[in-house]
Amino acid sequence: VLFGDGAGAVVYEAIDDPADSSGPGVLGTDLGADGVSGSTMVVPTLGSRGELTSTRDPANSRLHFEGQAVFKIAVRGMIDSVCRALDRAGLTADDVDLVVPHQANERIIRAAASRLGLSDDQVMLNIATHGNTSAASIPMALNDALDTGRVRPGDIVVFTAFGGGVTWGSVVLRWGDRVERLGTSDAALDPVEVTVDELLAKNREFFAPLYD
């Protein structure tokens, strides 16, 4: 899986009658964490327990990732989270029009979708073109879904994600009338005149004294 670089944003607005479950809005949510499995995907020296000394093992500053364990945890975590959110919404997987998952790994997404009984038409995938953009992946995938006409007014849309910790979350909502982006921008980034190695060298130079 290759990581991508991107950004996304979603703008919410209040609805006229929050008590009207037949109208647009959030129908069900689920959020959770399992610290017992945290060691399967972690950077040991980050956080309050990190070792800020020059004698630390450099390997502990890198991402430790147990691929097979993370695969199983992610698939099961997203399935259970989606089911709980749907249950709180009084719905089932048969009611879902589109799932927009965190684009971490296509195999994980397809495995979870298959076990939920979802067809390819019910799942938004864009990791093949954008890579894993981390927190930006769901808004970017939603943008692509809107651009390609895969979200219609009144659709039941599910967002679901998992991450380090390990953590997971899902949201079930009924889509409103707007099925196009708020607008487009012609803004452009300034040309980059340094390499990634040069940027990292500057970071190492800045942070090195903190580890002595």
Feature map (PLM): residue ranges:
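Condensing-enzyme catalytic core mediating Claisen C-C bond formation in acyl metabolism
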Residues: 1-72, 76, 80, 174-212
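Alpha-helix termini
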Residues: 17-20, 89, 149
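Short helix-to-loop capping/linker segments positioned immediately adjacent to catalytic or ligand/cofactor-binding
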Residues: 70, 85-89
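Claisen-condensing/thiolase-fold acyl-transfer catalytic domains that form or cleave C-C bonds
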Residues: 75, 79, 86, 97-212
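Short, surface-exposed connector motifs at secondary-structure boundaries
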Residues: 90-95
